[in-house]
Protein backbone atom coordinates (compact mmCIF):
# COMPACT_ATOMS: atom_id res chain seq x y z
CA UNK A 1 0.00 0.00 0.00
CA UNK A 2 1.40 3.39 -0.92
CA UNK A 3 0.36 6.76 0.52
CA UNK A 4 -2.82 5.47 2.21
CA UNK A 5 -2.33 5.07 5.95
CA UNK A 6 -6.05 4.72 6.68
CA UNK A 7 -6.38 1.84 4.21
CA UNK A 8 -3.40 0.10 5.82
CA UNK A 9 -4.89 0.56 9.28
CA UNK A 10 -8.27 -0.82 8.18
CA UNK A 11 -6.61 -3.80 6.51
CA UNK A 12 -4.47 -4.49 9.57
CA UNK A 13 -7.57 -4.55 11.77
CA UNK A 14 -9.40 -6.80 9.30
CA UNK A 15 -6.47 -9.24 9.01
CA UNK A 16 -5.33 -8.83 12.64
CA UNK A 17 -1.78 -8.16 11.46
CA UNK A 18 0.71 -5.53 12.61
CA UNK A 19 1.55 -2.59 10.36
CA UNK A 20 4.99 -1.81 8.98
CA UNK A 21 5.25 1.88 8.05
CA UNK A 22 8.02 2.89 5.68
CA UNK A 23 8.37 6.68 5.91
CA UNK A 24 10.28 7.47 2.75
CA UNK A 25 11.05 10.23 0.30
CA UNK A 26 11.30 10.58 -3.45
CA UNK A 27 14.76 12.13 -3.05
CA UNK A 28 15.98 9.83 -0.26
CA UNK A 29 19.11 7.95 -1.38
CA UNK A 30 19.30 5.88 1.81
CA UNK A 31 15.66 4.87 1.35
CA UNK A 32 16.44 3.52 -2.13
CA UNK A 33 19.44 1.64 -0.72
CA UNK A 34 17.28 -0.07 1.92
CA UNK A 35 14.67 -0.97 -0.70
CA UNK A 36 17.25 -2.41 -3.11
CA UNK A 37 19.62 -4.09 -0.67
CA UNK A 38 17.81 -4.83 2.60
CA UNK A 39 14.16 -5.40 1.70
CA UNK A 40 15.19 -7.86 -1.03
CA UNK A 41 17.00 -10.24 1.35
CA UNK A 42 15.06 -13.45 2.00
CA UNK A 43 15.13 -13.20 5.81
CA UNK A 44 13.84 -9.61 5.65
CA UNK A 45 11.17 -10.48 3.06
CA UNK A 46 9.97 -13.35 5.26
CA UNK A 47 9.51 -10.98 8.21
CA UNK A 48 7.91 -8.20 6.13
CA UNK A 49 5.32 -10.69 4.84
CA UNK A 50 3.96 -10.89 8.39
CA UNK A 51 2.89 -7.23 8.21
CA UNK A 52 0.47 -5.00 6.39
CA UNK A 53 3.03 -2.76 4.70
CA UNK A 54 2.51 0.89 3.87
CA UNK A 55 4.96 3.29 2.26
CA UNK A 56 4.35 6.95 3.08
CA UNK A 57 6.22 9.59 1.08
CA UNK A 58 6.89 12.71 3.14
CA UNK A 59 8.73 14.93 0.66
CA UNK A 60 6.23 15.40 -2.16
CA UNK A 61 4.31 18.56 -2.95
CA UNK A 62 0.87 19.04 -1.45
CA UNK A 63 -1.31 18.34 1.55
CA UNK A 64 -1.15 14.54 1.34
CA UNK A 65 2.63 14.46 1.71
CA UNK A 66 2.54 17.15 4.38
CA UNK A 67 0.05 15.04 6.32
CA UNK A 68 2.45 12.07 6.29
CA UNK A 69 5.33 14.26 7.46
CA UNK A 70 3.08 15.64 10.20
CA UNK A 71 2.10 12.08 11.21
CA UNK A 72 5.76 11.11 11.44
CA UNK A 73 6.66 14.26 13.40
CA UNK A 74 3.76 14.06 15.85
CA UNK A 75 3.86 10.32 16.54
CA UNK A 76 7.60 9.69 16.39
CA UNK A 77 9.21 13.11 16.98
CA UNK A 78 11.34 13.00 13.83
CA UNK A 79 11.20 13.76 10.14
CA UNK A 80 14.39 11.83 9.37
CA UNK A 81 14.38 9.43 6.43
CA UNK A 82 14.32 6.56 6.13
CA UNK A 83 12.25 5.86 9.21
CA UNK A 84 10.37 2.66 9.96
CA UNK A 85 7.64 2.03 12.52
CA UNK A 86 5.76 -1.04 13.63
CA UNK A 87 2.22 -0.59 14.91
CA UNK A 88 -0.19 -3.15 16.30
CA UNK A 89 -3.47 -3.74 14.39
CA UNK A 90 -5.08 -0.93 16.41
CA UNK A 91 -2.43 1.59 15.37
CA UNK A 92 -0.50 1.62 18.64
CA UNK A 93 3.25 2.11 18.18
CA UNK A 94 5.35 -0.93 19.07
CA UNK A 95 8.84 -0.24 17.72
CA UNK A 96 10.78 2.16 15.49
CA UNK A 97 13.94 2.01 13.43
CA UNK A 98 15.67 5.15 12.17
CA UNK A 99 18.06 5.33 9.27
CA UNK A 100 19.97 2.88 7.16
CA UNK A 101 21.63 -0.31 8.30
CA UNK A 102 23.81 -2.69 6.35
CA UNK A 103 23.31 -5.38 9.02
CA UNK A 104 20.54 -7.79 8.08
CA UNK A 105 20.43 -9.21 11.62
CA UNK A 106 19.82 -5.74 13.07
CA UNK A 107 16.86 -5.06 10.79
CA UNK A 108 15.40 -8.56 11.15
CA UNK A 109 15.67 -8.15 14.93
CA UNK A 110 13.63 -4.96 14.69
CA UNK A 111 10.98 -6.69 12.57
CA UNK A 112 10.72 -9.60 15.00
CA UNK A 113 9.74 -7.43 17.95
CA UNK A 114 6.47 -8.62 19.43
CA UNK A 115 3.74 -6.32 20.80
CA UNK A 116 5.44 -6.14 24.21
CA UNK A 117 8.44 -4.57 22.47
CA UNK A 118 10.73 -7.51 23.17
CA UNK A 119 12.59 -9.43 20.52
CA UNK A 120 10.52 -12.41 19.43
CA UNK A 121 12.17 -15.81 19.41
CA UNK A 122 12.49 -17.75 16.18
Language model feature labels by segment:
Residues 1-52, 56-122:
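Proteins that catalyze or organize thiol-disulfide redox chemistry
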